[in-house]
Amino acid sequence: MSLKELMAGLLLCLTFNTLLAEVRIYEGKVMDNSGKPLEFANVALQSLEDSTLIDGSVTDAEGKFAVRGSVVPVFLRISAMGFEDRIIDNPTSDSGDIMLSPASYMLGEVIVKGSRPMAKLKGGGVQVAVSGTYLANTGTALEVLGKIPFVAKSGSSIEVLGKGTPIIYINGRQVRDMSELDQLASTDIKSVDVITNPGARYASTVNSVIKISTVAHAGEGLSFNDRTTVGYKHYAYLFEQVNFNWRRNGFDIFGMLNYENYRERPRFSNTTFQYLKSGIVQQNSSGLEAAKYPVYQGKIGLNYNVSSHNLGFYYDFSFKSSSSIGRSLTNRYIDRVFSETLENFYDINRHNRQQLFSAYYTGEVGKLRLSANFDALWQINDRHTTENEITTMNPERDFTTCNDVKNRLFAGNLIASLPVWKGDFRFGTEISNIHRTDVYSGNAEFIRRNDIKISETTTALFAEAEQTFGLVSASVGLRWEHTDSKYRQSGQLSEDQSRRYHNLAPSVMLSSPIGNVNARLAYVRKTSRLAFEQLSSAVKYIDRYSYESGNPDLKPIYRDYFSASATWKDLVIEMEYSSTKNYFMWQTSEYPGSDDATLLTMVNMPRFNSFGAYINWSPTFFDCWHPVLMAGVQAQDFEISHADKIMKLNLPLGTFRFDNAINLPWGVWVNIDFSARTSGNCDNLYLKPYWQCNMGLYKSFDKDSWSVKLQLNDVFGTWRQDMVSYDALSSIFSKKIYDTRDLSITVRYNFNSARSRYKGRGAGNTDKSRL
């Protein structure tokens, strides 16, 4: 059956379901006797005739719930540990505030056993429960994400299969540094949402979103937690982090200090073939580098929650100074005849300083829900390089280069939502302003100086409606974006390179149960604009025969995604088709004025199509073994011109993962995880296969006040980055080797555990990523 036929069949089933029953949504807010919201209260919608369970839910952090059922005589049963049950006969659509009274007695020791599917369709993606499951004993948020359906983890990198690198949020706040995922303990995570079809509320450049929600700890006064990680990966390393929070009567002061000292020694070997007018040039290169990455980071902020209003701000600063020294050796051949040997020694020093001020407000005025965010970001990044170049054909030369970049971002958004008819209507606006300076210079005549200034303002408006018709839920959204970019070279405005973009990004989603299967169809349109470095016309020196430059004439990428998803018990399936226009990639051309040097720059490619299918199965056996089996395949009809011939790059790429979490006696958890990737094509790359095995032991003590995690990644040292890239004039066979066998031990201590109630989402989040 073709993908189009499957989508048509699912859509037909969804249409029939609208005729089956008239369904009403029952909403409300559960509070304790002091008026505070109750999280995790159980809400059951039952028939008045025979008490048959129709639907059930659990209240969120604000005490809110929503259940749905046919319009027949029903009643609501609300229960929570430590409180008397509350029964509401014949409830209306909005039950308002529901107050529970404290129980006059407490139960003795009770053991309740049950099971529920860990993953379910929600919104434009899949939601996975973490709290109360084996995933809570994984260690860190980064390790949890590596076990989530349709998510692939490689080192500290996270990718959503078929969608690339996601935007990640923790409690609505964007994660800008992946080390934040190592800082968050898995025991503090409530749930993870993987949104593969982000709607109009997200920027049109966002292809996927991961939202992490944390457990809301009760209690007031001072709380803090400390995390210490020591490990060995050829070099010893240390991570140290302290979080604190002081809470009283809805008022929070929170902060964080983080220090990291990390080193690595990447090695590489490349074989490059270039098809130039002077002949076929072959370069065999190898190199070794030693790098240090110390990190100093801190944060302080405050938060105030009163009734249905929340506001707060924080200030975050970081200083990252890295240094690396290395050597590369290249043997050069022309038409298979040895030409010369090129040897480079380099010393690179980088300094990255960042300051971020972020503020937010959320509240309710009647039925209108409001959310406002403001962010101000300053970055100073500099890179200083000293090189010594020795060749057998030319004189030795020493030179230095310097690249100084400064970024400033102001961004704000305002989002409003209110119940309309049988659902919600959400609308809002977002504005961001960026100013960037990029100065590149060197002390040699063959290095061009560039002084570039870019100022860019983006304005966005969006509207999104969600409605329920019978058993069918529908969502329709539209986002409009306008970007005005001014490009200046050496103080002079360049009209050709200054841009104005107008973009419309629609989204449509339908979901409904079909028997025991929950199904969803979705369409979204997304765009991608280049990072500012890729728009720079500055020509940067790589080696005697290689230069690199951005391309200010590039057009944005446009992608149309069509997807079908379904869940059944412990099984989750997703199929996807996408069409990509103006995809950009690196291309090699002959350097102007030279017969043997090349220039690497980005160009737009013709439209191509991609296909993907993914399946995730997460059962439980014997109440102690929790395996997860995930498999996926991606295919494309991509083709390029290579060495004056058309090359088709359409070999499917397979991804597999087999995770195992085993609960041993004495509360010890063992994790044994396998992952693998087949060979195949991805864009203009041919990726070679690899496999990897990770193992871990986890144990908590004193009611989770202490925890210890022993982890060994890449047990057999099999992970490699091995690939071949193709463009018009070159093919590059590259292999990068890292010290991926990594032994570490992490000790955490929690005192009076309480997480900040900060609920800001941030603004200009995709622009922060571009910076």
Where does each model-flagged region fall?
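Short, acidic Ser/Thr/Gly-rich low-complexity loop/linker segments typical of extracellular
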Residues: E49-K64
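Short acidic/polar hinge/loop motifs at secondary-structure boundaries
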Residues: R68, K147-P149, R173-G199, V242
